[in-house]
């Protein structure tokens, strides 16, 4: 097999040059990190589950007219995505107080917010992805005002879709993080959902019990991460309900 050209390796994924112009192969690793990679481990099967779940969410978004970079899943660990220019922001949508918001504002975890709150962080691991305002974004030219209007609209549409989907299977969407890519169609820029949507990037709590079904299981040593992610996948029908917790590792 021809050796592929690695473009970038992050904490949870590796990007390779795609087989067709304008495409990238996104490989999901089993590495788990927390607290800006201060805590690390390898969790067998995590990459397989995140690949399948991200495919499921991205496909669902495309079906309701939300543009994404996803093209198709290639195998158990890889998907083909559209190459795009990443906007240097993490976009966070919060429905309930948790994590850094609870610490920052002194709001008890689990408190429902008056409305979905959208926050922005600068993508910079060395600085710990600091929270920034729209004033910072405009002043430093990280995104235009039109971009910000489009990003807000995309983020809230993703929230509507994911919230309803999760509620239907007994899961509360506490918050989530997305990344935005810029593509050019006939020289006209367009913003799309990029990166991934998975339990790595969402806070998901069981509505009935409050059990955490996301990366907080790893952050806070609450049990098996693959068990939690598999439970989400089973409820959504992404893997069979009778399947054992660890997926068979193929490819």
From Swiss-Prot:
GO terms for molecular function: ATP binding; phosphoribosylaminoimidazolesuccinocarboxamide synthase activity. Pathway: Purine metabolism; IMP biosynthesis via de novo pathway; 5-amino-1-(5-phospho-D-ribosyl)imidazole-4-carboxamide from 5-amino-1-(5-phospho-D-ribosyl)imidazole-4-carboxylate: step 1/2. PROSITE patterns: SAICAR_SYNTHETASE_1, SAICAR_SYNTHETASE_2. It catalyses: 5-amino-1-(5-phospho-D-ribosyl)imidazole-4-carboxylate + L-aspartate + ATP = (2S)-2-[5-amino-1-(5-phospho-beta-D-ribosyl)imidazole-4-carboxamido]succinate + ADP + phosphate + 2 H(+). One of its GO terms (biological process) is 'de novo' IMP biosynthetic process. It is an enzyme of class 6 (ligase). It holds the Pfam family SAICAR_synt. InterPro entries: SAICAR_synt/ADE2_N, SAICAR_synt_PurC, SAICAR_synth, SAICAR_synthetase, SAICAR_synthetase_CS. Coiled coil: none annotated. Its EC number is 6.3.2.6. GO terms for cellular component: cytosol. Keywords: ATP-binding, Ligase, Nucleotide-binding, Purine biosynthesis. HAMAP family: SAICAR_synth. Belongs to the SAICAR synthetase family. This is Phosphoribosylaminoimidazole-succinocarboxamide synthase. It comes from Ruegeria pomeroyi (strain ATCC 700808 / DSM 15171 / DSS-3). The lineage of its organism: Bacteria, Pseudomonadati, Pseudomonadota, Alphaproteobacteria, Rhodobacterales.
């Amino acid at each position: 097999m021809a050796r592929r050209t690695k473009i970038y390796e992050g904490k949870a994924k590796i990007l390779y040059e795609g087989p067709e112009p304008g495409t990238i192969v996104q490989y999901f690793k089993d590495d788990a990190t927390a607290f800006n990679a201060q805590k690390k481990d390898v969790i067998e099967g995590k990459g397989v589950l995140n690949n399948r779940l991200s495919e499921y969410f991205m496909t669902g978004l495309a079906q309701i007219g939300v543009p994404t970079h996803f093209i198709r899943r290639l195998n158990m660990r890889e998907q083909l995505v559209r190459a795009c220019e990443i906007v240097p922001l993490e976009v966070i949508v919060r429905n309930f107080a948790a994590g850094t918001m609870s610490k920052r504002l002194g709001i008890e975890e689990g408190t429902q917010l008056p409305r979905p709150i959208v926050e922005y962080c600068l993508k910079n691991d060395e600085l710990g992805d600091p929270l920034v305002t729209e004033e910072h974004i405009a002043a430093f030219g990280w995104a235009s005002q039109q971009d910000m209007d489009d990003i807000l609209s995309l983020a809230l549409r993703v929230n509507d879709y994911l919230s309803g989907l999760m509620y239907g299977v007994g899961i509360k969407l506490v918050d989530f993080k997305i990344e935005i890519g810029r593509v050019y169609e006939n020289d006209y820029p367009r913003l799309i959902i990029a990166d991934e949507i998975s339990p790595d990037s969402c806070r998901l709590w069981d509505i009935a019990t409050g059990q955490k079904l996301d990366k907080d299981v790893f952050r806070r040593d609450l049990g098996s991460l693959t068990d939690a992610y598999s439970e989400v996948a089973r409820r959504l029908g992404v893997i069979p309900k009778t399947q054992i917790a660890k997926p068979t590792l193929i490819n």
